[in-house]
């Protein structure tokens, strides 16, 4: 049997790096606002897309629906999002950032942009190639 080199297996490399970077970034927003990684993904998506359903967020950020629902409930409890039922389909719950959520995102976006800029700087001239490769894989 041929040996398998896990360290050169691209999916493994990508998830290890993504997990490390997500953990590093999450310390920044958790310290300031007490939100978790799933909560960050929900509010970041809402900031970009406006009012959307839990189902749409689940599909867009590739998170289990129950995890999205729990994150949305915690965000609602903390006043960052508002939940409303879809009048045409009561099973669908729409999420919207509240003013408090918008204010939080106004403070978080520069932090995220700075984190991203540092990552891209660390790649130097390979940054554009790396972004293109990720886009091709995604």
Model-assigned labels for residue ranges:
Residues 12, 41-44, 69-70:
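Base-recognition residues in the alpha-helical recognition helix of bacterial helix-turn-helix
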Residues 73-132:
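Charged, amphipathic alpha-helical coiled-coil/dimerization segments
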Residues 54-55, 66, 73, 93:
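Residues within helix-turn-helix
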Residues 23-64:
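N-terminal helix-turn-helix DNA-binding core of bacterial DNA-binding proteins
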Residues 65-67, 83:
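A general lysine-centric signal
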Residues 1-32:
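N-terminal leader segment of winged-helix/HTH proteins
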